[in-house]
Swiss-Prot record:
PANTHER family: SSRA-BINDING PROTEIN (PTHR30308:SF2), TMRNA-BINDING COMPONENT OF TRANS-TRANSLATION TAGGING COMPLEX (PTHR30308)
InterPro entries: SmpB, SsrA-bd_prot, SsrA-bd_prot_CS
Protein name (record): SsrA-binding protein
Pfam families attached to this UniProt entry: SmpB (PF01668)
A single BP term in Gene Ontology: trans-translation
Bias-annotated ranges (Basic and acidic residues): 135-158
Family: Belongs to the SmpB family.
Gene from which the chain derives: smpB
Length: 165
């Protein structure tokens, strides 16, 4: 059986983009997986590994979830049929999930933030988070907690090294 050449990328389980600032600016309550309705040149551009979730967010309009401000650059081999880089893209979820999300968003002053964009079995998926925005003092508390944890880990490492020497 012939093997694939090593130069060919396996895009079946590839993370295309991740929103690293989302975990800093929001406290994540729940995560969901949704499909993304795309056109052909968008998928080809994503297979090149170029996309930006930096300013992206999701909204609910007329019972449908839309991903806004996701930047997928134009496909470099595309012609006049190329897509608009920042167009609104429909997210594909079950009706029960959408209704559940709408209720939670309205009740708890929450928002939908995309965390990552990836391929699963040839299909493009987005990991959405139901999140609440952090204020400045929340961010400072998180930083202090991480610093304290880092100090504990460092001290434990020193003690273990001291015992083995």
């Amino acid at each position: 059986m012939a093997k694939k050449p090593k130069s060919v990328k396996d895009t079946n389980n590839m993370v295309v983009a991740s929103n690293r600032k989302a975990r800093h600016n929001y406290s994540i309550l729940e995560t969901y997986e949704a499909g993304v309705a795309l056109v052909g040149t968008e998928v080809k551009s994503l297979r090149d590994g170029t996309a930006s979730l930096a300013d992206a967010f999701a909204t609910v309009d007329d019972g449908e979830i839309w991903l806004r401000n996701l930047h997928i650059p134009e496909y470099h081999h595309g012609s006049w049929t190329n897509h608009a880089p920042r167009r609104n893209r429909k997210l594909l979820m079950h009706r029960r999930e959408i209704d559940n999300l709408v209720g939670k968003i309205r009740d708890g002053n929450l928002t939908l933030v995309p965390l990552s964009l990836y391929f699963t079995g040839g299909k493009v998926k987005v990991e959405l988070a139901l999140a609440r925005g952090k204020q400045a003092h929340d961010k400072r508390q998180d930083m202090a907690r991480r610093d304290a944890q880092r100090e504990v880990t460092r001290e434990l490492g020193r003690r273990v090294k001291g015992m083995t020497n």
